[in-house]
Amino acid sequence: MEKKKLIYIVDDDLFINTLIVKRFNSEDYVVESFITGEECLDSLDKNPDLIILDYLFTGESLIFSDGMQIFDKIRQLKPQIPVILLSGQEKGEVVLEFARKGVFDYIVKDNNLIDNLAVSIKEVFSREV
């Protein structure tokens, strides 16, 4: 039996976190959710197979205020882990910057979020074969 893939979702929006965990926790995936980048980074020793990362975070006590900072730290610590970025809006310059840095995919949080994420997750794991 093949080991389940470990996916991290990092988003300060509890609705999005819950939606993704409920949809993708399955026979194939184990999904762990985090509200802050710090929580995710503290758990990188579990070596997730994929990280789904929000672009914009809110909160006064956060060390990391946006997904770019968290992404850079993930790349520094675990460069082999693919990252899918989520955002509430399409920003061309942000998409280009993340593409240059090596993000696997950039998905807008819209009505097609779950469908688009499902396709992207399959693409990530199909490239491992």
Question: What is the predicted function of each stretch?
Answer:
Residues 11:
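Conserved acidic carboxylate
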Residues 14-33:
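Two-component/phosphorelay signaling modules centered on CheY-like receiver
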Residues 32-50, 54-59:
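Acidic, metal-coordinating helix/loop segments flanking the phosphotransfer/catalytic sites
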Residues 61-79:
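Short amphipathic alpha-helix used as the core "switch/output" element in two-component signaling
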